[in-house]
Amino acid sequence: VKIVNEELTAVLGAGVDRPLNFAKNPPTIIMLAGLQGAGKTTLAGKLGYWLKDSGHTPLLVAADLQRPNAVTQLQVVGERAGVPVYAPEKGVQSDGGEAVVSPGQTTGDPVKVARDAVELAKQQLYDTVIIDTAGRLGVDEELMKQARDIRDAVQPNEILFVIDAMIGQDAVQTAKAFDEGVDFTGVVLSKLDGDARGGAALSVASVTGKPILFASTGEGLKDFEVFHPDRMASRILDMGDILTLIEQAEKKIDQETAEEMAAKAMSGDLTLDDFLKQLQQVRKMGSMKK
């Protein structure tokens, strides 16, 4: 079990511990990409809140102009997070500062919205720009072209692929398509508060080789954390705190005796005396309550 856990942790990115790639000259531009329903808009607010809490001055950008009410949703999320939102039409004002409204001619043109937002961020001294892009129910070329156009227009420092942790086997094909389409630089897992153990994380990390940077673990703005490969490996294996148990066993149980018992068990020669010895070894570990 320990070996499997270690290998899973390695695949998920043990030792990577890569922070966000911040620009030497602000603003740092972060573009979010993913399928519709993956939770990009909500995650944009969480990331903005996390950055604000870390001392940054983020600006959210509503570049999803296709999904009904997507702009309004981001404005509401921005208001809750206390982070201003740049949008192509006037809407809810954020508590994070003055309402940021783009010129009317940008309506319907997500590329221009993104480009103008970056220029405004430079003027108003926002140090981070988070661009929420449109998604689809499935991968298609129109989606990828729009994402590529935005990428080419603003040259983001990070392109974060947002994926639903409950997506299952579709994670592989989706991740491949977005990796080939926009060449994302990192992954964010959303909806980890559900029943999913996070197998999608293993699939995406293995197929793309891109680091998983963050995980969204609930509906609240604060339910957002830096990704920890070791914890995700334990979640996938549904192990709980079994690693501590393994460490205790390694310390207390004699290795030579354990190998002898394993050999007897494999050959079918295990006796009641051997079973007694095993119980005595387990007893050395202390109370079962521990």
Label for each model-derived stretch:
Residues 1-100, 111-123, 127-131:
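Primarily NTPase-proximal linker/entry elements flanking Walker-type ATP/GTP-binding cores
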Residues 114-118, 122, 126, 138, ...:
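Conserved phosphate-handling catalytic cores of large alpha/beta enzymes
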